[in-house]
């Protein structure tokens, strides 16, 4: 709600958060209580799919409240102007619908494409900057990736040690990026994990993610309770969304986002446990 309020009254434009040349008419990006619009968007990507499942699982009174919350959340993520957040939420919805009934996927894709001409001009222009190397934030990320490449050449096997503070100190032993500063993290969950823990740590992390997703999908297919299936599909969708965002953002930099990440991981684990219990009862 506070994010929607900020979108209504407007917030100060922060030049470091948006390219003022390519997005000249774009208003300030809302951040709610999270100080950073991308972090706010990450929270919404992880939680909005659960809200959608709550809407489907509730009776009429619960549907009213969850629908209101869902609409407010969708509006708020629009006001963040977070491109990675939009991509993550779109993927989360597609995964959610694909698990429930894959026939929904072509329909939602057609609706999404048909809606593009009706988007506000500022959002449409923001979408067009995705992948544009002239955009300052895109250029900033590629500069960080280049510095990370230099670091990986020295530490790819054993890593530099746990924590973004350690990574920041090691970055300061390499040349600065184009604006004269040093990166504080890699702007990528997987590069960050690799840089901190080495190649074995990265492989273990990827194995954990794949195992959890595989367990979730198997439990979804085995579950008989439609409410559990919806909740599990939502959790898997939100998890896929935040994993994709992790390609462009270090989503664990802020503890609150890391907490929600592991909360979502735990929701999948809890649903898997419930699905197994239900299966055991049916076979007993």
Where do the model's predicted regions map?
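A conserved mid-to-late transmembrane alpha helix and its immediate loop/hinge
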Residues: 36, 74, 79, 146-149, ...
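Membrane-interface junctions at the ends of membrane-embedded or membrane-associated helices
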Residues: 55-62, 219-225, 270-284
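A membrane-periplasm/extracellular boundary helix in multi-pass inner-membrane enzymes
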Residues: 5-10, 80, 97-138, 146-154, ...
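Transmembrane alpha-helices of multi-pass inner-membrane enzymes
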Residues: 103, 107-110, 208, 237-284
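Alpha-helical transmembrane segments of multi-pass inner-membrane proteins
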Residues: 1-26, 32-99, 106-114, 118, ...
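Long extracytoplasmic/lumenal interhelical loops at the membrane interface
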Residues: 17, 131-146, 154, 158-197, ...
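Short glycine/proline- and charge-enriched loop/turn segments
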Residues: 21-28, 91, 126-132, 171-178
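Membrane-interface catalytic loops of GT-C/OST-like multi-pass glycosylation enzymes that act
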Residues: 34-37, 81-84, 183-188, 249-260
């Amino acid at each position: 709600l506070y994010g929607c309020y900020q979108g209504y009254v407007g917030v100060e434009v922060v030049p470091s958060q948006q390219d003022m040349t390519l997005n000249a008419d774009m208003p300030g990006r809302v951040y709610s209580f999270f100080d950073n619009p991308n972090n706010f968007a990450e929270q919404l990507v992880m939680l909005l799919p659960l809200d959608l499942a709550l809407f489907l699982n509730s009776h009429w009174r619960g549907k009213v409240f969850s629908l209101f919350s869902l609409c407010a959340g969708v509006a708020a993520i629009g006001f963040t102007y977070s491109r990675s957040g939009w991509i993550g939420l779109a993927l989360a919805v597609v995964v959610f619908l694909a698990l429930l009934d894959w026939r929904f996927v072509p329909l939602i894709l057609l609706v999404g494409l048909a809606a593009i001409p009706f988007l506000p001009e500022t959002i449409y222009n923001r979408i067009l900057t995705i992948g544009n190397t002239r955009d300052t934030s895109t250029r900033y990320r590629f500069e960080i990736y280049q510095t990370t490449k230099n670091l990986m050449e020295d530490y790819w096997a054993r890593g530099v040690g746990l924590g973004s503070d350690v990574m920041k100190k090691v970055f300061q032993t390499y040349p600065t990026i184009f604006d004269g500063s040093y990166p504080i993290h890699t702007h990528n969950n997987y590069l960050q994990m690799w840089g901190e823990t080495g190649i074995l740590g990265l492989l273990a992390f990827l194995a954990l993610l794949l195992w959890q997703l595989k367990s979730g999908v198997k439990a979804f297919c085995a579950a008989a309770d439609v409410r559990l299936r919806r909740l599990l599909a939502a959790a898997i969708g939100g998890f896929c969304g935040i994993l994709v965002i992790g390609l462009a953002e270090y989503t664990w930099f802020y503890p609150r986002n890391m907490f929600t990440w592991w909360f979502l991981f735990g929701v999948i684990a809890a649903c898997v446990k419930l699905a197994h219990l239900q299966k055991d009862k049916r076979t007993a």
